[in-house]
Amino acid sequence: GCGTGCNTVIGSRENRMYRYEPRQNDAVNSDWMCDAGRLDYKWIGRDDRLAKVRGPKGGTNWPSALKEISDHLAKADEGSVAIVASARQTNEELFLLSKLAKRFKALTDAVPRSGEADHLLVAEDRNPNTTGAQLTGITTKRVNSKLGAIAKGIASGKIKTLIVYGEDVTQHGIDAKLLGKLKILIVSDILPNATTRKADYLLPGCSH
């Protein structure tokens, strides 16, 4: 995806996705979409897609995991929580994370993605919702400006709880060794990565 925001139609059958197609919007993408966007769906049905909730002791269920997370956060001190969200999340998800961040005075940020623009359909910003992340206060005009501070906070022991949505933070300055210093790592994602493997609580995410 990218920041253009092409209007699309999803072709699916029996809970399996088969295609993206452009939906006409003359103000954004007319009748077109790029080939990369059209074909960017196969990961949704990957065999290794995350499907089961995991807690510190292994497999668990949603009610138990959410209660344990809630109980932990209820005891968290202000400034001891940080959130790394994704600029690929919806406005609604980002808004709720921003409310959680305000409750704990948490440091928050997102991960930037960029590529070459074609000045027609493909934007340089390869995140579809950087604007939403900025408007909700999750990140600033310079996306990733606070990731370094989050890493330093974990290293110093000030940040004890990290919440990660849809990103592999080990690729962005918060490595596995730092993650090991946390009291609790809460991760929601769709596909496995180095961050999901380190999670104390793993909550499978939704693609659409």
Model-assigned labels for residue ranges:
Residues 1-208:
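Catalytic alpha/large subunits of respiratory electron-transfer oxidoreductases
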